Amino acid sequence: APRLENIGKRMQAVKMIHDLDTRFRLMDEFGNYGHVISLPNPPLEDITEPEVGANLARVANDAMAELVRKHPDRFPACVAALAMHDMDATRVELHRAIRDLGARGVQIFTNIAGKPLDIPKFQPVFDAMAEYDLPIWMHPARAATMADYASEERSRFEMWWCFGWPYETSVAMARLVFSGLFDRHPDIKIVTHHLGGMIPFFDGRLRPGLDVPGRPPPAEHPPAVLS
């Protein structure tokens, strides 16, 4: 896919992502250490058509479940990959991965081919995971083709990755909060990659930004979120 033209090169350079022997040697440096494994970048929605994406998700989940069976001391569990451009296929694979393969969660990305996670189309995934009481891993999805400025065609100097990924995570998570997800599912579990993006470090900025003196809160913000 054009917008992910460099991500394969980046992933290949991190050998422990795709080479088990390298990963095992690294894990051995930390003693009794295990990984809950997931499918790395790129998002399936960005590189495939819906039918192909659903097939790749099944192949990936079968392969990860097999790694867990072969190496339970290394990989105590896996989280399922989903291809979310076809929600009917997504629901089928979500239930299969958890019920049949023993996946202990699912991984999604901060946007689905440019669409935000908080729109109604994607809510069945959150509803299902709240029912299972299993976590959702949320990984940032942003490429160099998302420009830093409106006058440019692409991001420069790796800003899309260094700053873009934490921003992506923060916006996606904040919008899930303000959309009322945690009002509907107060016990839902979401694991954000990379220490939660910007949010844990921006408390002093978030509070005045969302609570401007003398201005009523935007109507779209649920009162419970701002209280």
Give residue spans per PLM region:
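Helix-coil boundary/capping segments in enzymes
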Residues: 1-227
